[in-house]
């Protein structure tokens, strides 16, 4: 369910009641801290870009991984020239629907230092989507992942601004 759904609101109300119950049970002067690991955006069918249906996007991509909001693309032999060509083609195709598209080599310039362990799993090309856009590939993603309305993973403020609620009993 997306974060604007009735189901989402019902879960927030349950959480609110649980925190209120916790606040009644802990000793006076206890600080309760509630946070999340990421924000969310809602998407829909009109915001899905299907790689398998777009030959220009599928060309020279041998594997797809990551989140629909932050997709990792792999090119044959991890060739840097091929990665640069794929990145440019994706920039041309997606335009403003992508927040950032770059090669693994460019990732540290945009995302900060990339450790050795992370560098080993990063795609040859990284695609961070903007607004409510997602990249899907039914050859890789399950149907439930493709139709999921509430998504995260990109580097938009809605996804990286983390809520932090505190109260002192």
Q: Which residues fall in each region the model found?
A:
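Feature captures the catalytic ectodomains and active-site-proximal regions of enzymes
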Residues: 1-169
